């Protein structure tokens, strides 16, 4: 087999990209290798200092902890060097002389957040607090406290030249923060906060992707947590995020979390900052120190570091404030220890235990405080609570199962609608854009379900089933229906909306010669599938990107989009007006004595009502139920407005069914379509010949005589003009014969010219 030059170049490029990609640690140059080694060495040195530290020792050469709050009061321009002249490193007290917190913040933590009432041994707190907590956050002060100088080591800086191999020495002090909005300050007075709590019980090795269960020696007393904290003003114009590790004191319900970056190695500060009280300080210090050391050894902390850790730490140091977070949980004194254990076992492994999960109280933060030592910002929390993660997963699973039932109902309704319009003439009356809008929503839902299945492993099975059901509905049934609609209307593509809406007192000229175009459903299907997937990708990316927009812009986009996507009956109303469907009384009159099934309304009322209800239920749930799983705000007024809008569309469809599809338009606004029922002239008989009887012609389908109405011959005026049909190509057939023929083909049986639908 010969390989041309282009193929060879392509193979070489692919092999180059494959073999030149960074390894498991992300290092792609000697400079980055030295950066990573410097970072690992720095952490190893500081860990050795941490291991030798006792409760009575102060912090020594640990990044971000070299200066106390009192040091900054003494000299606001003090550099973070070690050792500081005259500073005693062999003593430790929980005050501003040794901590990065001012005394009034320490006092607030001791009296308002971690008060002594929580030391009562009778208090019981849940050992598992995995959840998402939502609440309010208030600014206490952003200009009262002195800012502690926290330099960033220069070896974190990216290389400025490809020839560089050695990262620079020294540290960088930011005299003025980069002007990137409000990243280094909090300017709003009141806002909203979301705290995602997860236990560090299942850790993953960054190199070999092995997961191992991390269980510390005092697992019943202490827990290591991962915290993701996001807070912003109500309009979401100013957003802040914190990703940090935390220590959870199960006996006292206290949580301490400290952010970490290249300017603040907070992991080594957890033991000292957890021991605030006068009683058991040293014991708490030793327990937390042992917990941190176990985590360090279990994860091979420095060995698994990658260049991503270097870049993330550097970006966090440049663009974010460091925060210390102190939280106090509400006790669950209504339960015993055995009951709490039973609840945890049932949530982790549901077996039907008598745990009464429906009355399980939320994880409630009764008091909380956030303080930033390098930005001098103090924040307070209130009304922060949330349900257990397992309960939330159970609730979402029920919602997904209900959604699957809705998809099944929608598939059933669509199949009945397809059976109702099982002829080309009936399909021709369906609006292509009506079902395109419905199809776009269903296809996007399928894509979002597939994305969510990879993000939430606990819901993988119901999400995949939902995605599969929605994908079948969108890509098989709805696309197949759209292909039939498009194929039946392909000969109308030259008839634009402007032409249809122009004023015309005449009849639309169906007699002009047109090419006999036979639609190929294979090519139409390929075109529609390509368009479907393209629109699906664009629309899905638009929806996902909108979640990160400011709230006001996001709400405007959301409301407009929902309104447009719930206007799916408008194209069908327009299509009905274009096709000129007669009123119900006229349809009943014309059906007497003949097969006039083609005059039926194109949409079944069961399909219209059922589809409207099915597609309205999710919107009603999200906008009216304040505890919805999407954490969406409540807006009953919008639901009422949307319901009235849908009711208006259905009312117009019903009025078209009763009064005729053009009742609201002036006469002759839209040209009349071709009429198959018309008298013939004497010239027609002379040109096309007659049948075996006088004043008749032969029906090419049944080969029988067709009596016809001839204008010039009065004795033929007794013939019912609806008993025969005249095609645009001037061929005459029995009405029943041609209607049955047009159930399968919209082509003349004689000359194969395209026929306008009934």
From Swiss-Prot:
TM annotation in the entry: 399-419, 432-452, 459-479, 524-544, 554-574, 603-623, 636-656
Pathway assigned in UniProt: Protein modification; protein ubiquitination
Signal peptide coordinates: 1-26
Catalytic activity as recorded in UniProt: S-ubiquitinyl-[E2 ubiquitin-conjugating enzyme]-L-cysteine + [acceptor protein]-L-lysine = [E2 ubiquitin-conjugating enzyme]-L-cysteine + N(6)-ubiquitinyl-[acceptor protein]-L-lysine
Chief localisation class: Golgi
GO MF annotation: an example: ubiquitin protein ligase activity
Topology in the lipid bilayer: Multi-pass membrane protein
InterPro entries (UniProt xref): DUF2921 (IPR021319), HRD1_E3_ubiq-ligases (IPR050731), Znf_RING (IPR001841), Znf_RING/FYVE/PHD (IPR013083), Znf_RING_H2 (IPR024766)
GO CC annotation: Dsc E3 ubiquitin ligase complex; endomembrane system; fungal-type vacuole; Golgi apparatus; Golgi membrane
GO terms classed as biological process: proteasome-mediated ubiquitin-dependent protein catabolic process; protein ubiquitination; ubiquitin-dependent protein catabolic process; ubiquitin-dependent protein catabolic process via the multivesicular body sorting pathway
UniProt keyword annotations, A-Z: Golgi apparatus, Membrane, Metal-binding, Signal, Transferase, Transmembrane, Transmembrane helix, Ubl conjugation pathway, Zinc, Zinc-finger
ZnF RING-type span: 699-752
Subcellular location, record wording: Golgi apparatus membrane
Pfam family, one: DUF2921
Topology feature Lumenal, residues: 27-398, 453-458, 545-553, 624-635
Cytoplasmic topological segments: 420-431, 480-523, 575-602, 657-758
Domain of life: Eukaryota
EC number: 2.3.2.27
The protein's role, per its UniProt record: Catalytic component of the DSC E3 ubiquitin ligase complexes that tag proteins present in Golgi, endosome and vacuole membranes and function in protein homeostasis under non-stress conditions and support a role in protein quality control. Mediates ubiquitination of vacuolar proteins such as CPS1, PPN1, PEP12 and other proteins containing exposed hydrophilic residues within their transmembrane domains, leading to their sorting into internal vesicles in late endosomes. Targets also the unpalmitoylated endosomal SNARE TLG1 to the MVB pathway.
Self-association state and partner proteins as the record states: Component of the DSC E3 ligase complexes composed of at least TUL1, DSC2, DSC3, UBX3, CDC48 as well as VLD1 for the vacuole-localized complex or GLD1 for the Golgi/endosome-localized complex. Interacts with UBC4.
Identification of the protein by name: Transmembrane E3 ubiquitin-protein ligase 1
């Amino acid at each position: 087999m010969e390989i041309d030059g282009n193929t060879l170049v392509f193979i070489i490029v692919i092999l180059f990209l494959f073999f030149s990609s960074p390894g498991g640690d992300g290092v792609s140059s000697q400079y980055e290798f030295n950066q990573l080694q410097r970072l690992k060495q720095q952490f190893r040195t500081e860990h050795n200092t941490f291991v030798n530290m006792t409760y009575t020792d102060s912090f020594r050469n640990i990044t971000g902890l070299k200066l106390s709050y009192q040091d900054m009061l003494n000299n606001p321009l003090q550099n973070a060097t070690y050792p500081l002249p005259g500073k005693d490193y062999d003593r430790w007290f929980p005050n501003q002389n040794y901590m990065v917190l001012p005394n009034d913040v320490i006092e607030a933590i001791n009296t308002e957040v971690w008060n002594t009432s929580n030391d009562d041994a009778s208090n019981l707190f849940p050992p598992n607090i995995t959840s998402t907590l939502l609440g309010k956050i208030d600014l206490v002060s952003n200009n009262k406290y002195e800012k502690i100088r926290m330099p960033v080591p220069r070896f974190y800086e990216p290389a400025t030249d490809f020839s560089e191999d050695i990262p620079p020495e020294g540290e960088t002090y930011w005299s003025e923060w980069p002007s990137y909005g409000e990243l280094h300050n909090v300017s709003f007075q009141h806002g909203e906060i979301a705290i995602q709590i997860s236990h560090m019980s299942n850790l993953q090795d960054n190199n070999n992707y092995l997961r191992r269960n991390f269980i510390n020696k005092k697992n019943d007393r202490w827990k290591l947590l991962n915290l993701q904290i996001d807070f912003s003003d109500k309009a979401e114009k100013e957003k802040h995020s914190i990703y940090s590790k935390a220590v959870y004191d199960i006996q006292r319900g206290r949580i301490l979390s400290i952010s970490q970056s290249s300017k603040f190695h907070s992991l080594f500060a957890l033991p000292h900052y957890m021991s605030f009280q006068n009683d058991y300080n040293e014991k708490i210090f030793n327990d937390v120190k042992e917990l941190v050391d176990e985590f360090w050894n279990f994860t091979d902390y420095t060995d698994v570091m990658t260049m991503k850790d270097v870049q993330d730490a550097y970006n966090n140091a440049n663009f974010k404030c460091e925060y210390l977070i102190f939280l106090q949980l509400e006790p669950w004194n209504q339960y015993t220890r055995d009951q709490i254990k039973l609840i945890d076992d049932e949530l982790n492994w549901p077996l039907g235990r008598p745990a009464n999960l429906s009355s399980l109280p939320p994880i409630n933060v009764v008091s909380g405080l956030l303080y930033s030592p390098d930005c001098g910002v103090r924040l307070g929390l209130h009304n922060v609570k949330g349900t257990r993660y397992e309960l939330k997963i159970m609730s979402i699973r029920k919602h997904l199962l209900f959604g699957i039932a809705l998809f099944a109902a929608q598939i059933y309704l669509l199949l009945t609608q397809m059976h109702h319009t099982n002829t080309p003439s009936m399909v021709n009356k369906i609006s292509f854009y009506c079902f395109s809008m419905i199809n776009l929503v269903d296809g996007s839902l399928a894509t979002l379900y597939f994305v969510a299945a990879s993000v939430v492993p606990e819901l993988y099975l119901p999400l995949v089933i939902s995605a599969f059901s929605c994908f079948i509905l969108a890509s098989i049934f709805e696309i197949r229906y759209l292909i039939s609609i498009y194929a039946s209307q392909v000969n109308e593509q030259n008839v634009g909306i402007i032409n249809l809406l122009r004023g015309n007192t005449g009849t639309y000229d169906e007699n002009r010669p047109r090419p006999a175009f036979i639609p190929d459903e294979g090519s139409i299907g390929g075109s529609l599938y390509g368009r479907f997937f393209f629109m699906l990708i664009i629309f899905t990316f638009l929806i996902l990107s909108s979640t990160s927009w400011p709230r006001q812009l996001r709400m405007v986009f959301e409301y407009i989009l929902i309104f447009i996507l719930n206007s799916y009956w408008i194209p069908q109303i327009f299509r009905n007006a274009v096709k000129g469907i007669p009123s119900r009384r006229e349809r009943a009159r014309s059906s007497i004595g003949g097969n006039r099934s083609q005059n039926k309304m194109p949409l079944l009322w069961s399909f219209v009502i059922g589809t409207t209800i099915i597609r309205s239920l999710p919107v009603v749930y999200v906008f009216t139920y304040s505890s919805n799983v999407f954490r969406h705000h409540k807006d009953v007024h919008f639901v009422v407005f949307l319901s009235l809008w849908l009711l208006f569309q259905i009312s117009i469809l019903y009025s078209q069914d009763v009064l005729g599809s053009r009742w609201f338009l002036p006469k002759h606004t839209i040209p009349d379509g071709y009429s198959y029922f018309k008298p013939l002239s004497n010239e027609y008989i002379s040109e096309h010949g007659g049948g075996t009887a006088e004043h008749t012609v032969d029906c090419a389908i049944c080969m029988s005589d067709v009596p016809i109405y001839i204008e010039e011959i009065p004795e033929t005026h007794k013939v019912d003009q609806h008993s025969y049909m005249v095609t645009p190509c001037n061929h005459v057939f029995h009405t029943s014969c041609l209607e049955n023929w047009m159930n399968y083909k919209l082509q003349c049986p004689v000359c194969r010219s395209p026929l306008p639908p009934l």
